[in-house]
């Protein structure tokens, strides 16, 4: 590859894994927004909050994809899966925020390892 600039296969793989994590977080936040948008839940401020969080994670993934391409890597997204979410109790709001905090901590830890 002519435009590859000091970009090892390991860097490419690890960045692709991180891109997948960002998209997984985006999907998870999107699912939370969808849950709080249900007519039997109807917490519109949380819909807005999680919709913005979803967009933010998607934008992060896009930035990493551009960087990967710029360095001569090939973007491959494997294992893009949202976190399993089960919200059907009075503690839904607390559980949603715990999930969001855990997602942010996990992504931050992976970034620190990169």
Predicted regions and their residues:
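Disorder-to-helix initiation segments
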Residues: 1-19
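Juxtamembrane/interface segments of multi-pass membrane proteins
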Residues: 7, 39-45, 87-92
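Residue preference for a single heptad-register face of alpha-helical coiled-coils
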Residues: 14-17, 21, 42, 49
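Acidic/histidine-rich alpha-helical segments that form the ligand environment
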Residues: 18-21, 25, 32, 80-114
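Conserved alpha-helical segments that form or flank metal/cofactor-binding pockets of metalloenzymes
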Residues: 30, 38-80
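Conserved helix-loop functional segments at active or binding sites
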Residues: 35
């Amino acid at each position: 590859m002519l435009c590859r600039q000091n970009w090892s296969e390991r860097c490419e793989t690890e960045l692709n894994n991180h891109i997948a994590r960002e998209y997984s977080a985006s999907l998870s936040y999107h699912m939370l927004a969808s849950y709080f948008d249900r007519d039997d839940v109807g917490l519109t401020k949380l819909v807005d909050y999680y919709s913005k969080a979803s967009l933010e994670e998607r934008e992060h993934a896009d930035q990493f994809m551009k960087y990967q391409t710029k360095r001569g890597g090939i973007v491959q997204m494997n294992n893009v899966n949202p976190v399993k979410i089960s919200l059907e109790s009075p503690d839904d709001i607390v559980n949603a925020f715990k999930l969001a905090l855990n997602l942010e901590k996990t992504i931050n830890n992976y970034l620190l390892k990169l």
